[in-house]
Amino acid sequence: MNIFNNNLHETDKDIDEIIKHEKIRQSSVIELIASENFISPAVLEAQGSILTNKYAEGYPSKRFYNGCEEVDKAENLAIERAKKLFNCKYANVQPHSGSQANQAVYLALLQPGDTILGMSLDSGGHLTHGAAPNISGKWFNAVSYSLNKETYLIDYNEIERLADLHKPKLLIAGFSAYPRNIDFAKFREIADKVGAYFMADIAHIAGLVATGEHQSPLAFAHIVTSTTHKTLRGPRGGLILSNDEEIGKKINSALFPGLQGGPLMHVIAAKAVAFQEALQPKYKSYIQQVISNAEALARILQERGYDILTGGTDNHIVLVDLRKDGITGKLAANSLDRAGITCNKNTIPFDKTSPFITSGIRLGTPACTTRGFKEKDFVLVAHMIADILDGCKNNEDNSKAEQKVLTEVTQLIKLFPFYG
């Protein structure tokens, strides 16, 4: 049997159909999940290449397998492009995910039982920053900081108080749902005061940092972690950066052989392509449009009477607080989904509602901006969202509003390109 002549449709019609239907779904909805984006055909081509066949444990020129000449070139390109993109001295492109990038830092710099200080999950932090169900909350003494109860902004005085009290070994900045800029210099000041390492997780804002639309943490943090998708618009994967090459050596050993085995060379090649795309001038214009679109989305939703957490956004994220409207995040997200608008339910700071229900929704602009949406289009999208939310408030059965908006979504989305 010659497998080299087989295609997916002939080999596995079930998976082939799933992929075709998912392509139809992605092309026909307004995608507002803040952690999602659409990668270029070039990135897809690299990720689906024969580099997936190559095992390459170790690092370039220090592999445990022969035949790594070409994949060494690919990884070196990814490393050098990442260093250029973020203007830093060290990069590791091997983490399979953002979570594993964070785990590698913990393995390199901490011992079980050490104290870490990160943003609480309900304030917009990430599972890997010390949440109880996560390994970071099980292996370490995890202390969490919250937001200011009046402004919903990061409370640096509270972080400093907690750092003085608990003396963490590692202070973490970063989030999965926070719409404002972070003062990395202040975080480093607090870390230095208590003798802690400072790690910045920029998974959501890596594209903003790379283009200068958000302060870079690399002048302040001992170590920076990120994903390579989201605003960076690359393949799903992780990335570790630093200007401290001694810490970089510890990270390398922690990641391999400490945490991972063979790197995914097809994904690393795709990361290299994405970094090359992000180094082009038009990528900065893209990120600026992402932010402008988020601002337009937040503004119209406010005009329609909805509470936007912190009163707006500095990045790609818009958090809608639905508590005063008597709508759960789950109800809103499901109704929007039926209307052709995809987002996610999201917890609101200091809200006691179950994370499976929530009192808010999180909206993001990267994916639709990739398809070509401008501010005027997000004005229309905001009105569509508000129409659905109005219906959720007024009627248990929201099917009439959902059908109306679905028709509007279908008409709008046809104007924007998708994969051929």
Swiss-Prot record:
UniProt-listed CDD domains: SHMT
| Localization in the cell | Cytoplasm
Positions bearing the site annotation: Plays an important role in substrate specificity: 229
Residues the record lists as binding (6S)-5,6,7,8-tetrahydrofolate: 121, 125-127, 246, 354-356
Any one GO molecular-function label of the UniProt entry: pyridoxal phosphate binding
Q: Name one Pfam family in it.
A: SHMT
Instruction: Report which superkingdom the organism of origin falls in.
Output: Bacteria
Keyword annotations for this protein, in alphabetical order, are:
Amino-acid biosynthesis, Cytoplasm, One-carbon metabolism, Pyridoxal phosphate, Transferase
The top EC class, named as a word, is transferase
Cofactors required: pyridoxal 5'-phosphate
Q: Which GO terms describe its biological process?
A: glycine biosynthetic process from serine; tetrahydrofolate interconversion
Where, per the database record, does this protein carry N6-(pyridoxal phosphate)lysine? Answer: 230
Report the protein's function: Catalyzes the reversible interconversion of serine and glycine with tetrahydrofolate (THF) serving as the one-carbon carrier. This reaction serves as the major source of one-carbon groups required for the biosynthesis of purines, thymidylate, methionine, and other important biomolecules. Also exhibits THF-independent aldolase activity toward beta-hydroxyamino acids, producing glycine and aldehydes, via a retro-aldol mechanism.
Which family is annotated?
Answer: Belongs to the SHMT family.
NCBIfam families in UniProt = PRK00011.1
Assembly and interactions? Homodimer.
Q: What is the name of the protein in this document?
A: Serine hydroxymethyltransferase
Which source organism?
A: Rickettsia canadensis (strain McKiel)
Q: Which gene encodes it?
A: glyA
